[in-house]
Amino acid sequence: MKPISFEISYETSGGPRRISAGLGAPFETQDLSVCPHVDGSRITCSIETKAELTVTGFSLELAHEFGAKDRVLVNGYQSWTDTVELPVRSRMRGVNDIPGPVLRKWVLDGSGDYRFADYDGKPGHLHGYTYAYVRTDGACELVGSLDESDGFTKLEVLADEGKVIVRPEVPLGRLAAHETHTLVQLVLVRGSLDECFEAWFTHSGITARTTRPIVGYTSWYRHYYDIDEAKLTADLEAARDAFAQVETGDALKVFQIDDGYCTVGDWLAVNPRKFPRGLAPLGASAREAGFTPGLWIAPFVCEKDSRLFKEHPDWLLRDDDGNPVKTGCHWSGGYALDTRNGAFRSYLAEVLQTITRDWSFKLLKIDFLYAACMLPHDGCNRGQLMHDALELVRSAVPSEVLLLGCGVPLGSAFGVVDYCRIGCDVGLDWDGKLYMRGLDRERVSTKRSLANTIGRSPLDGRAFANDPDVFFLRDDVKLSAAQRALLLETDCTHASMLMTSDDMRCWDEQARLFYQHAVHALLDRSGANTTRKA
């Protein structure tokens, strides 16, 4: 890829303007100076304003001669978005072909980029965020953003035109005269796939907070919302007994309570029928059994039936027409919260501190994080909102608390969360019903989750420790023995977490041996295998 030119559009008191030029010396107008800088593999472009103005768009054009054998990967919008190597002439489908009533009822445009990104469906027109690469016969060229905290970086592959267009989010609002603002920071690297990712993260200065693998149990794929103290106590006992027979080395053993303990948004109002003693006793029991207690929370959303929705309408994120912004069809309807609202920020900090300090949960699975950046507002673009929201969570919890991000634009999570989901939810079957396969790119699918585990594996141990979602060894799912084996083998060789929702008491000796083999493979990859016998 070769940097060729830039284009910037802006508005002054004299009206809208647009200029384009090659990436040579600084380019000046009466309104601003554009300062591109190419230093080896690094490209930066900044502006210096001479008058008050609003930047409305910026793009950088890279030239690339695509070949018929090229494979292209563009990183999807968030954790669940499909991200795999594709033939260069592939088409990228959005939700344009879904009938409007279906789209609206199930809010199928809520979790992706469909509300603000174009999907033209043309062969070779692909887009993603933060990074992309082209690979042919082992040789790789990667373009990666060095900083997403000031805005997301969209990457558009136009194979038929021999171009890659870089479109960073621009500042929201008016810039004063004599301001300097960096619009984009990129790195272009070549080599093997591993060499490219290593060079990119070296340039960025980002390092993973941990490389310690996790093994353990989560309640979701066994009980879904139908959890209570008795069920989870039985699950904990089963997990304790099962792990007593497994060599886990230095892996962290986690027992995680997932969704279903309260109405979403009312995090401290734990359902007294399900958990008459609250959640703290279960967390204490998990610690006594040798596990790190974990808890699921979706910090930036609430459901329509919550007290929060009814009592704090001013905390809801609203569109230009004043309507609450829907994030999906989950629960009684999911709605985004305004993460810039001071009262909400105080409430969330209190919730997180109660969970981690008073209830003593030491791992938080923070989910549906994309809700924080549904709409640019309060002077912040989407990338700035996501960065700010994650920093709010990180600063509210004790330093030793581990964060597992999910449903998050990945670039914002680099170096911030300890563990991160890198694919969609697995299902209890292989690829869902036939009619589901034409829906959004974030849909539940074991097949697509597994593909994402491979596609995003280079991030593991560099950006964070990768969470591939759970595996299944139980036989009451609609997965063949070969599919279950492939899922577990892929997880232990491409990621850093081996979590299950199986009733581990029902595993036979063959299943236990298969799991032990997978744990050994996981530990060997991470260097955490301190117990394996020679």
Language-model regions, residue ranges each:
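Non-catalytic C-terminal accessory modules of carbohydrate-active enzymes
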Residues: 502-534
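Flexible loop/turn segments at secondary-structure boundaries
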Residues: 223-227, 262-266, 300-305, 371-375, ...
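Mature catalytic domains of secreted/periplasmic carbohydrate-active enzymes
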Residues: 166-170, 174, 194, 199, ...
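Carbohydrate-recognition beta-sandwich/jelly-roll modules
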Residues: 2-251
